């Protein structure tokens, strides 16, 4: 039986264990963060406490490079296995600005976006804001789950948000000192499309409850209270959405990918991508999803 190292013990790991076991793949969660890892030890030591032995029995393949890149690099070196979505895939998707730059270069539709690399003069920020019709979305380049994303209705609010980002970026250990300024699409519907090897295998629409909308919420992240409902992508949006998402996966060359679409009456745009997407309930995927995922895992060996 193939041994799969899974760098998470959350929903994805819980949901994949039984379906993959039925397909000859044994999964085991590995902890790569918030622990100590011996990277070098004296000869003749306990092998279970050194090298790859610290992660349990030997593995054949890993499922998605670990979320913390530094510790993930240590685990990668010690485990010496191929990954479904390696380090380069994670980096290509994690940097929102880079993702949108590659997609835009390929002619795919994306929101109007400016990447700001701190520090910059206030005059630069004023020029950036002047290029948009307010309000504008301000988001850190590398965060997930809607963390740090804000809406600026006017110039003073925009500059105030940028001031807070300056405080964060002033800390010398901050690796990514960039952020995005984007157009706001207030009435857009929000979809997450899942792809395996460039093929759509499922989609959900993320909606906020009426109470949340009434309270002024606008972010559609599930971790922020949105509800995800499985949809048939072609029935909901037609062939254009499928074509756009599959083209995005091809451009980014990421085999296991979530693509976030914003859809208005006249536009379908790729807003973000996620190379570490959570596996949802099986009912939200097309038939054959688990077979496709098992095939992708085996293809890495």
Language-model-derived ranges and their functions:
Residues 136, 202, 257, 269-272:
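Protein kinase-like catalytic core scaffold
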Residues 259-261:
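Hydrophobic residue at the +6 position relative to the catalytic HRD Asp in the kinase catalytic loop
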Residues 153-244, 248:
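Phosphate-binding site of ATP-dependent enzymes
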Residues 7-117:
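Conserved N-proximal alpha/beta basic substrate-recognition cap immediately N-terminal to
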Residues 236, 250, 254, 263-301:
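C-terminal active-site "lid" helix and adjoining low-complexity regulatory extension at the edge
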Residues 1-5:
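Extreme N-terminal starter segment of soluble prokaryotic enzymes
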Residues 80, 92-180, 184:
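Active-site nucleotide/adenylate-binding loops and adjacent lid/helix of ATP-dependent enzymes
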